[in-house]
Amino acid sequence: MTDTNVNIIRLTAAEIAAKVASGELTAVQVTEAHLARIDAVDEKVHAFLHVDREGALAQARAVDEKRERGEKLGPLAGVPLALKDIFTTEGIPTTVGSKILEGWIPPYDATLTKKLKAADVVILGKTNMDEFAMGSSTENSAYGPTGNPWDLSRIPGGSGGGSSAALASFEAPLAIGTDTGGSIRQPAAVTGTVGVKPTYGAVSRYGMVAFSSSLDQGGPCARTVLDAALLHEVIAGHDPLDSTSIDAPVPPVVEAARNGSVEGMRVGVVKQFRGEGYQAGVLQRFDESVALLKELGAEIVELDCPSFDLALSAYYLIAPSECSSNLARFDGLRYGVRVGDDGTRSAEEVTALTREAGFGDEVKRRIMLGTYALSSGYYDAYYGSAQKVRTLITRDFEKSFEQVDVIVSPTTPTTAFPIGERADDPMAMYLADLCTIPTNLAGNAAMSLPCGLAPEDNLPVGLQIIAPALKDDRLYKVGAAVEAAFVEKWGHPLIEEAPSL
C-alpha cells in the first residue's frame, strides 16, 4: 500500500467526510484506498463475504460529481462502510451467512440500505456473520470463520464478527451490525471498536432478515464514539414499512458525542454483572473504568437486579421460539437454494431436504429448541414463563433508572477466545452474551467502547454503557467523555495498538 493509502485508511469517518467535503480528498481516492486494503489483508481476516468493487466506485464517483456541481453533501458523504450480510441490497448477494440463501440476489434494498445510499455513504460490500445471526464467534458462518485482527487465531465476536473485524483491520471506517443478544456490542468489545445497540424500534428492520423479531435491532459500528453517532443519525428514524418502528424524533446523538461529559451524572453498577466466569483482567479494566467515571465527576450507585441472573435462560427460550417461526419461510420453494426437486418428490420432501442441507447445526439446534418451547402443552411452561422473566427484567431496569442516568458493566465476561475453543460447547458459547442480553429483553439502548487491554493476554476489553429507551444520546455523552479520558491516559486511541497485519 502507498503511504497516502495508509494515511487515508487510518482516518476517522468524521475526518474523511470533512476532507471529501472540502475537496482535499476525493471519494474515489478514499474508496480505492480501502479496496486496496481489503485486497491486501482480507484473505487473512475474511471480514467480507462479498466486495462490491464496481458499485462502491460508482457511488464514490457520484459523490465527487455532486460536490463538483456544488450540491449539498450528506454528513458522511464519501465515507466507506461495511454492511452486515443480513440487510437486503438490490443486485448484490445477501446470504445471512447461510447456504440456504447462497447466491440469492434481492430485488430490493432494505430501508437501512436506502438511507445509507441517500446519505452518500459508499457501501464497500457485505460482511461475514454467524448464520442467521445465531452465534457469538462468527464460526457458525457457512462460509468459514473470520479472524480477530488483534490475533487471527481468535474470534472477532459474533454474530457480527465480519463488521467488527473490518473496522479493526482498517478495511472500513464504518460498519453496520445487528444486535439480538449482543451481536453488535460483544464483537466491538473483543476487537477494540465501538458498537451501539439503539433503542428497540429506533432503526428500521424492513429488509433485515429476521431472527427474533422482538429482539433484533440494527445499529452503528465504528472506531470512535463520534463516528458511531454520525452513522446512528443517518440510519435511525421512523419507517412505516416496519410495524415495530418507533415514531419518535431521533435523540440528539451527534450533539451528545461532541459534548461528552459525566459531570453530575449518576452511574449504576449492577452487582449481578460479575463473579464466576469473568476473566480477572476484564474485571480489572472494568473497575478502572468505574474509578475513571468517578474522577470525571460521576456519582457511582450500586444496583441490585436479581432478575438479570435469569436473563440468559429466558433469552434462550424467547429467541429460538421466534426463530423457529421466522425461519419457516425458508422452504426452498420461493427463493434461495432448492434441493431434491427432481420431479418425483412432493413439496414437503423438497422442503425437508432443502432445510436439512441448507441450515447449519446451530440454526437447526435453535429451530428445534424453539419448536419444542412453542409446542402444545409446553408453551406456558417455557415460552410463557420466559416472557414473565422478561417483564421482571424490564421492571428491574425501570427501578434502576429511577436512581441512575446510565448503567455500566463489562460488555462480555472474557476477551476473544481461540477459534474452535467453544465450538462443541454451546453453553460456554452462550455465556459470551451474559451482560448484553438483559438490554435486548428490555429494549433499551446500549454501547460498547474500548477500556483497555487485559493484562493476561493483551487483548481488548469493552465497557458497556446502558441507557433507558429513547435516551440513546446519554450513551454518546458518557461514551465520548470516557473515550477522551482514556485517549488522554494512553496517549492514543487503543486501536492504534492493533497489529498492522
Swiss-Prot record:
Keywords: ATP-binding, Ligase, Nucleotide-binding, Protein biosynthesis
Enzyme Commission identifier(s): 6.3.5.7
UniProt key word Nucleotide-binding: yes
Catalytic activity: L-glutamyl-tRNA(Gln) + L-glutamine + ATP + H2O = L-glutaminyl-tRNA(Gln) + L-glutamate + ADP + phosphate + H(+)
InterPro entries given in the database record: Amidase, Amidase_CS, Amidase_dom, AS_sf, GatA
Transmembrane segments annotated in the record for this chain: none
Function: Allows the formation of correctly charged Gln-tRNA(Gln) through the transamidation of misacylated Glu-tRNA(Gln) in organisms which lack glutaminyl-tRNA synthetase. The reaction takes place in the presence of glutamine and ATP through an activated gamma-phospho-Glu-tRNA(Gln).
PANTHER family xref list: GLUTAMYL-TRNA(GLN) AMIDOTRANSFERASE SUBUNIT A (PTHR11895:SF151), TRANSAMIDASE (PTHR11895)
Subunit structure, as described in the record: Heterotrimer of A, B and C subunits.
Name of the protein in question: Glutamyl-tRNA(Gln) amidotransferase subunit A
